Amino acid sequence: MCNTPTYCDLGKAAKDVFNKGYGFGMVKIDLKTKSCSGVEFSTSGHAYTDTGKASGNLETKYKVCNYGLTFTQKWNTDNTLGTEISWENKLAEGLKLTLDTIFVPNTGKKSGKLKASYRRDCFSLGSNVDIDFSGPTIYGWAVLAFEGWLAGYQMSFDTAKSKLSQNNFALGYKAADFQLHTHVNDGTEFGGSIYQKVNERIETSINLAWTAGSNNTRFGIAAKYKLDCRTSLSAKVNNASLIGLGYTQTLRPGVKLTLSALIDGKNFNAGGHKVGLGFELEA
């Protein structure tokens, strides 16, 4: 078993309550399907109501389970091509090696990353290295777990300048229905979040963040309520008086509709509110 989260997944439950079930200012469509040969296809498109700009992407994924290989190809409307090859749980249980490349045909620009991660019950660690001969940037992270407590560190080192460009710490606690997460980024940005699963229907979350040398404190609360197995309501508000509301309805197995709205509580009569529509189809 490899239950220790990665550094980026620390506090994920609280983030999901704040972020999932909303899509302000856009119309979004997500489609997922799988062929008889095992190739997974997923595509998404969204159009912003403010600007009218539309974009989309297509992803195909094929797994060779006997060898632990996964091949992923990506394309988006910015004409960026991506290829990812990963090898997992073969050299060692919990070890994943990945080659991720990006190619932009219009400009000829090429970039890539080598990634490695290793996850076990009591720890997880990983590293990414940019493929850049002029001076790659090295990213690294580690998370230790002990009786529900989690401690993490994340860094990035710019070899061209020979200095740390990122230096982050995190500390938290995770239980079945409760999670606490705190973090410090580069010694100047501080934040924390609390997640509570009240019961099978209600989830709540609180987050707080501030920057050293600034009076700009950010605070928000969010909740999700499941009316039944097909319907859920979401709501959130922050100290800027921005109120988010979301409604998610499973129309039938594999078909989901999401409606959301962002209301400016300080300027309620002035307009400027945003609405969103999302449609997910999986077959």
From Swiss-Prot:
There is a cross-link at K53, K109, K110, K266 (Glycyl lysine isopeptide (Lys-Gly) (interchain with G-Cter in ubiquitin)). It catalyses: chloride(in) = chloride(out); K(+)(in) = K(+)(out). Signal peptide: none annotated. One of its GO terms (cellular component) is pore complex. InterPro entries: Porin_dom_sf, Porin_Euk, Porin_Euk/Tom40. Keywords: Acetylation, Differentiation, Ion transport, Isopeptide bond, Membrane, Mitochondrion, Mitochondrion outer membrane, NAD, Nucleotide-binding, Phosphoprotein, Porin, Spermatogenesis, Transmembrane, Transmembrane beta strand, Transport, Ubl conjugation. Disruption phenotype: Male Vdac3-deficient mice are infertile as a result of reduced sperm mobility due to an abnormal mitochondrial sheat in spermatozoa. Ubiquitinated by PRKN during mitophagy, leading to its degradation and enhancement of mitophagy. Deubiquitinated by USP30. Interacts with ARMC12 in a TBC1D21-dependent manner. Interacts with MISFA. This is Non-selective voltage-gated ion channel VDAC3. The lineage of its organism: Eukaryota, Metazoa, Chordata, Craniata, Vertebrata.
